[in-house]
């Protein structure tokens, strides 16, 4: 399968991966190319910006949760869905080789190796010049299975500064695709779990367009496309949700023809993997969004509810005010309607969140805490194991009956 692609990586976090990757997606789209966006790992926030920049669903490539064997099929699926793209741009995670518990598992390098994707390193040039070439040399030689094909210089102080770094990289045979100057005009707000999601930030579309303009001015887009075209063909069939259900032993549902499933959405619930919706549809369900900030009741005829992730704690007052929907959710739960809740969804089902009344489906209170809980988790029951990921600053406390 022909699949032009690059992976945007860096020596460490905070060097500009998201700025460059998101801006590159926006710039390529503005130039008339169709971009398939991806993020290494389980993160929901960056794909929200990728989606805004590319006009397509932002997708994840997580080998820890999904397994190595699904990385290339998921990449191919995102490349051809909803229509074939011209290039796949994959944003890495942390430093190039950083992964689970220091093993490199799930790292950008692992995804690059598994999918045979050339790597473009974002070099934050602040505080040094030629030394950056030594760092990139280490990245390029640390693992012979990882192809460091190019570099983009970020936060360049002056043309002379950029030329010094580029000269060092040229000695390694690594071309520089662009030099982005230091600028304070591009700012994306952050809070306790990283960037503010694109769906919650009113200026996000304007800022993403600004990133695209910045990249278009300082990065050679044609050179990026040429580098992506060097990626070898993949001998793989795109992941298919219907086939995935069949291989998992799915035998249908007992809810009649085309049952309706509601999925929480809106500013308080922005976290959702597109493959979840695709699998529900492939399983014969109709899917409708429910915004707990504005919708006063669940849709008529609803037979299931999926409450994904987000930041309900940032909207707790408005969620509490919409008591009609909370009452409706609780009534449906008491009547036996299936509900799947994760992360923010669990918080919404508690009785209180930071003192604000929630749906009260579960006899628990939830509250924000200072401690960050982060990492992959494995849940096992009856010899069946499911891998998930925790990333939050909340606690739940069971209440006495």
Identify the meaning behind each predicted range.
Residues 5, 33-34, 258-260, 286, ...:
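Residues that mark the start of a beta-strand
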Residues 112, 254-257, 270-279, 286-288, ...:
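C-terminal and late-domain segments of enzyme folds
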Residues 259-321, 327-334:
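Phosphate-binding active sites in nucleotide-utilizing proteins
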Residues 312-382, 386:
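Cysteine-nucleophile active-site neighborhood
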Residues 77-81, 247-252, 295-301:
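Short amphipathic alpha-helix with an adjacent loop that forms part of the alpha/beta core around
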Residues 129-251:
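Internal gly/pro-rich beta-alpha loop/helix module
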Residues 39-40, 176-184, 286-294:
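Beta-strand->loop->alpha-helix junctions that form or flank phosphate-binding loops
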Residues 2-19, 25-115, 123-150, 159-163:
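ATP-dependent carboxylate-amine ligase catalytic core
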């Amino acid at each position: 399968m022909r699949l032009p692609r690059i992976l945007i990586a860096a020596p460490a976090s905070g060097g500009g991966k998201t700025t460059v990757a998101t801006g590159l997606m926006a710039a390529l789209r503005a130039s008339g190319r169709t971009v398939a966006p991806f993020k290494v790992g389980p993160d929901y926030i960056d794909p929200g910006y990728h989606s805004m920049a590319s006009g397509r669903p932002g997708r994840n490539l997580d080998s820890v949760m999904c397994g190595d064997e699904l990385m290339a099929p998921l990449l191919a699926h995102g490349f051809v869905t909803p229509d074939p793209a011209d290039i796949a741009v994959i944003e890495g995670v942390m430093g190039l080789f950083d992964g689970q518990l220091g093993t490199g598992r799930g790292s950008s390098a692992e995804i690059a190796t598994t999918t045979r994707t050339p790597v473009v390193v974002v070099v934050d040039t602040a505080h040094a010049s030629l030394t950056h070439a030594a760092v990139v040399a280490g990245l390029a030689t640390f693992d012979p299975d990882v192809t460091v094909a190019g570099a983009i210089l970020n936060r360049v102080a002056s043309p002379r500064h950029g030329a010094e770094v580029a000269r060092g990289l040229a000695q390694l045979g690594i071309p520089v695709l662009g030099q982005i100057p230091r600028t304070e005009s591009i700012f994306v707000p952050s809070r306790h779990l990283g960037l503010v999601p694109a769906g919650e930030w009113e200026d996000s579309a304007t800022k993403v367009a600004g990133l695209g303009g910045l990249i278009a001015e300082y990065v050679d887009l044609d050179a990026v496309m040429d580098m992506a075209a060097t990626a070898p063909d993949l001998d793989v069939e795109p992941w298919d949700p219907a086939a995935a259900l069949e291989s998992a032993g799915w035998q249908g549902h007992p809810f009649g023809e085309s049952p309706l499933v509601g999925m929480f959405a809106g500013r308080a619930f922005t976290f959702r993997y597109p493959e979840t919706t695709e699998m529900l549809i492939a399983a014969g369900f109709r899917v409708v969004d429910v915004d707990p900030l504005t919708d006063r009741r669940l849709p008529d005829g609803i037979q299931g509810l999926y409450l994904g992730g987000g930041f309900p704690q940032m909207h707790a007052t408005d969620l509490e005010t919409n008591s009609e929907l909370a009452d409706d959710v609780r009534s449906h739960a008491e009547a036996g309607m299936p509900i799947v809740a994760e992360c923010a969804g669990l918080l919404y089902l508690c009785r209180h969140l930071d003192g604000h009344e929630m749906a009260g489906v579960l006899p628990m209170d939830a509250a924000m805490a200072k401690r960050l809980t982060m990492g992959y988790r494995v849940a096992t029951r009856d010899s069946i194991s499911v891998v998930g990921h925790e990333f939050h600053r909340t606690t739940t406390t069971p209440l006495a009956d």
